[in-house]
């Protein structure tokens, strides 16, 4: 797009602030863009057996809008979504196939799915050479099968001449490393009797995701895997053999395909292919009109767990999901009723039992986990666990302990873990990691009152060969590491090192990186640090660490005063750099443009006055949020000269930052805060960008703003592309839940207690889980 045309189209940018020239506008131009109220393009939401489910209804092969561009590989029509339990993730697609992924010993696929192929399907063979099944490519002619995505299940519903096939993949609750398959075949009353063979088919496709490894090297590593196949009456066991263990991850897995059907026992087989076998169970069936036959299978890691009644087990698992996920209500935002339980199911379904470090990891996922093969960053795992404190506190604690295990005995947390769970310390050296651990610990204690958890044994990463300590001492060391080692930089603010929350904050060509790393500072870290340390202090005090508590409080007070002094007359500065030859008075980041991430924290930590807070809200309304249906941009005004304007940190719309925006403004302008929560919702994305699949069930960490040529999608860089895996980023699930809790006025206090006090004048809504409830 030419610059002149761009300014004509987006001349409203910054006009309200006088920061960039306003173009001539008609009255219609000044109104917010109208959002379509059409039904979801791809299908419809409904409640089924007390749980939210989404019915995918379109014919993706014929629909022009189904084609999407992942940027780093060819365009395709595969729309996928991720569900899981606490041991694995299932990637299910509109093609009717799935993949099974886990992080037990590292990033690997037990059954790989990509844009071309997946695993796990039903094939039905009938007389006369009739062949059809659950794959979209095997659907009966002139039909569009229903594909249903549920909180922990995926199903395909197809029909041919009166014979209905309903195939469901269910992730059982807990740490089970396998899935349950239910195949139900029903013959209508007006059909002729049928003889058929059902084939349960699972091609073996291994895949290992060593960090930053090319597809070619990953292909090579997968080819180092062969299988030793053993068949018995009820199951096929496939034992992996690693012919070149250095190129794989973890120990060889023992996989199984097991027939759990109590009456219809099938015939086991393993079809040899050029690369790996396909595990199959063939079952012959005779159906009379009105008959229903149900077949049951188990697929995944081998297990000795007995399932005497798969039907009862299946119902028990659904009942557990219903009792586990929270319920929410709101007259103002009725879709909260489905979105809160949905988000929590997706969030807890992203957890993985960790066989190396213990506890559970909660990867940010999306392209970071499924593409790059990393668990990044430590802050993200900790951040995503915070809302789980209110529904699954034991899982939140498990994630806290697991993430603290990443670190070293001096209190340092690495930026990330590699695909084989090694600390990644060379890429980025962020300065905020410890704050997220202290925050999660403080919120956990305030909500549960469980102080005994902090006396539990706590390990360090095995690479450090260090003696274990307690969780309390680990967190205490992290606090001192943040205060003493990260320390202070320019103008007394917390040092920025080479990044803070914003990994790209030092990428501006006008910034001297070396001097910033040495002495540069982050007002964002100071503001967040002030809030966090003030909540961590009472936890330390309650654990008998008075000196640490006093240090945290005094540091929090100092930082709050420094943040207050960084007000530049319009907003709070973003950061400071030391004097250089080219900039003898020092560098100021965020004086010419309003960086959103620091502003809410300045309000939350108490640095912003009432007048400043109200002034900031007006800037948010007339700037960051203007004409943006999905919420506030991270920077305002955007740099129109940049080809990636409106993407990522160049003005994209970030879940993590907009959660703090909602939280902070809920105390000042509750109506605005609620509107921003709605902008964050799946409902809103479906209304604003109805033909974009991402945003229907899940999303990335950030959306592209309206000024981006790819508005409503997500960012891409020359290094890697979030657009290549634009769903299952845990920010898209954790932040709406935490923002809803904050709208209800639920947050930890400086006394170590929990506040429950909504600023909303009307009846806002409720949040009820098995462990916590609040309503207004």
Regions found by a protein language model. Give the residues of each.
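Extended glycan-interaction surfaces of carbohydrate-active proteins
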Residues: 329-373, 400-418, 479-519, 561-655, ...
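N-terminal export signals
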Residues: 5-25
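Polysaccharide-binding surfaces and accessory modules of carbohydrate-active proteins
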Residues: 170-272, 281, 313-320
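Beta-strand-rich recognition/accessory modules
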Residues: 178, 254-317, 516-519, 532
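Aromatic-rich carbohydrate-recognition surfaces in CAZymes
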Residues: 374-494, 523-526, 530, 651-665, ...
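An extended acidic
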Residues: 38-43, 47, 84, 89-159, ...
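Extended, loop-rich substrate-binding clefts of extracytoplasmic carbohydrate-active enzymes
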Residues: 130-178, 263-281, 765
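C-terminal capping/lid segments that line or modulate ligand- or cofactor-binding pockets
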Residues: 32-61, 74-99, 343, 373-376, ...
